[in-house]
Amino acid sequence: RLDLLVNDFANKCMRDGYLVVYEKNFMRTFIHVDDIARCFTFGMKNVNKMINNVYNVGDNSMNYSKEEVCNMISKKTDAFIHFEEIGEDADKRNYIVSYDKIKSLGFGTKIKMEEGIDQVIETLKVVDFGNTYTNARYF
């Protein structure tokens, strides 16, 4: 999904060679789809401990500012990042999430941000955006 922040930023950096970012200090939390899948299994195995509770799924180490994410992507793509001080991002989400509750049960993420960025970049290299049926999974 290219509408997700990391995927969108990496795509623009690779396609255009630059990225303009507003509100660089806004915080977001991230999780890799593989870790989400692992959490489903974790939940099924720990249903008796988790029943009737609500959990944030992720890891405290995955709370990043937009600037931190951009700097990681820039190092891997050599794209120019411009942090614009004037203007606004239409997406006003700015938050840090605590994952202490699920961590206390033994769940934590395994895929770090930089590994996820590497995967996105490698996928973007093989996707033919002119072909509706291109899917990196087949390469």
Regions found by a protein language model. Give the residues of each.
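Flexible, glycine-rich beta-alpha linker
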Residues: 1-4
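C-terminal substrate-binding subdomain of Rossmann-fold SDR/epimerase-dehydratase oxidoreductases
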Residues: 13-139
